[in-house]
Amino acid sequence: MERVLIVNADDFGLSKGQNYGIVEAYRNGVVTSTTALVNGEAIDHAAQLSRELPALGVGMHFVLTLGKPVSEMPGLTRDGLLGKWIWQMAEEDTLPLDEIAHELACQYQRFIDVFGSEPTHLDSHHHVHMFPQIFPIVARFAAQRGIALRIDRQTVLNADDLPSDLRSTQGFSSEFYGEEITEACFLRILDASAHRGEASLEVMCHPAFVDNIIRQSAYCYPRLTELEVLTSASLKAAIAERGYRPGSFLDI
């Protein structure tokens, strides 16, 4: 059985080093798709690079934890900035859901303005779209626009009122992340997906060259390791041997 493999590089637009790393992993590696933070410092640079790579699928990386929002969000921001306190607010069930829904629409329009087209799919920075309170908002938004959505199905099992026409891959993995990133790790993800009988799989990654912005990230130098693994000729061959076809969210 032929299986579709989407290797999606998150954080397009975060910095020039991140952008160049993603492009390198696409041109000379196994990355097939990316998602962009429209409030990133290098988002215009990302859009410029993407115009040279029309086959690279570019989706939107919905942001509620970093930088400035596109719209006014007094209920979620502190001193005008987004941050990781969103986890505490989610636990306390005090999320400003109307603000979040409006911000999603504004970021989506910002994406269209910057890239000149709709995104191939949606996901989010730090997976905040998988919060039980937020997921129905994002799922309905994606379904209404006919675009795909990253779904961690272990989490979605607890969500109610999901659109029946929501598109996603059958499998998703965030395991290619951390301090122990190897080619063997990547291939274990593929083998586990094949064992489950999944016809499509998304693997999340964050390849980058380190610059001053990336150096400020808690997840810094492993991005270089990811880039090295993802551009390995042996990895590309091993993926093909397993019957996977590289694709984007336009293929599901």
Curated annotation (Swiss-Prot):
GO terms for molecular function: chitin disaccharide deacetylase activity; deacetylase activity; metal ion binding. Gene3D superfamilies: Glycoside hydrolase/deacetylase. Coiled coil: none annotated. Keywords: Carbohydrate metabolism, Chitin degradation, Cytoplasm, Hydrolase, Magnesium, Metal-binding, Polysaccharide degradation. Its EC number is 3.5.1.105. One of its GO terms (cellular component) is cytoplasm. Mg(2+) binds at H61, H125. Its cofactor is Mg(2+). It catalyses: N,N'-diacetylchitobiose + H2O = N-acetyl-beta-D-glucosaminyl-(1->4)-D-glucosamine + acetate; diacetylchitobiose-6'-phosphate + H2O = N'-monoacetylchitobiose-6'-phosphate + acetate. Pfam families: YdjC. It is an enzyme of class 3 (hydrolase). The keyword Magnesium applies. Pathway: Glycan degradation; chitin degradation. It comes from the Bacteria. It is found in: Cytoplasm. InterPro entries: COD_ChbG_bac, Glyco_hydro/deAcase_b/a-brl, YdjC-like. Disulfide bonds: none annotated. One of its GO terms (biological process) is chitin catabolic process. Involved in the degradation of chitin. ChbG is essential for growth on the acetylated chitooligosaccharides chitobiose and chitotriose but is dispensable for growth on cellobiose and chitosan dimer, the deacetylated form of chitobiose. Deacetylation of chitobiose-6-P and chitotriose-6-P is necessary for both the activation of the chb promoter by the regulatory protein ChbR and the hydrolysis of phosphorylated beta-glucosides by the phospho-beta-glucosidase ChbF. PANTHER family: CARBOHYDRATE DEACETYLASE (PTHR31609:SF1), YDJC DEACETYLASE FAMILY MEMBER (PTHR31609). Belongs to the YdjC deacetylase family. ChbG subfamily. Homodimer. This is Chitooligosaccharide deacetylase. It comes from Salmonella typhimurium (strain LT2 / SGSC1412 / ATCC 700720). The gene is chbG.
